[in-house]
Amino acid sequence: MNEAVERHDLKILGTSSSVGGVFKDVKVTGECTFGGDVDCHKLAQTGEVAIKGNLRAQDIKITGECEVKGRVDAASLRGQGELTAGGGLRIEDIKLTGGIIVTGDCEAEQVQLTGILEVSGLLNAEKLDLTLFGPCRADTVGGGRISIKRSRSGALLRPGKKLSFTARLIEGDQIELQHTQAQTVRGGSIVIGPGCEIETVEYREVLEVHKSSIVRNTVKM
């Protein structure tokens, strides 16, 4: 984060636009389009924000939709809504109800997400706690403790869509899955809950498989 530039707050009320730049705190109530990069201490939005460059912040709090064409780098993300990152995402601590859509890799220390997650590349988190409210996917999932479960209260589903998580590879130390489809699941302690379809499970310590799930191959490492 650029600290050599003097920072000022930016407040947007209603519908407006900005070229972007370096700010202290950015607060948007309404709609705002930033034409370039945004570098700030805090972004707080209620409504819709579009950033045509990269977003770099300490804290992000969203209520609504935030679309970033470039990369997102932040220490924390909180709120209710949807964040889209077109050039990858790195946020240390995520706690969100809504959706995260990333083109590229998504890296975090902790992720607590209730909603929808789409990552075209690697989803890497030391602790991942995902509650499915719709179809979710990632190419590869890696981490320490991974928990993927289905919401009990309902689903945001389009006709013909399954409430499931899909990945090519899921790898972690402790893994607990529900309603997940994967080619390979690899880890230490693995619990395959209801509604899963896994081609191969490779485990070091413990493997439990729910009677409603399908695991075609198991390998004790």
Which role fits each region the language model picked out?
Residues M1-M221:
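Extended beta-solenoid/beta-helix repeat architectures
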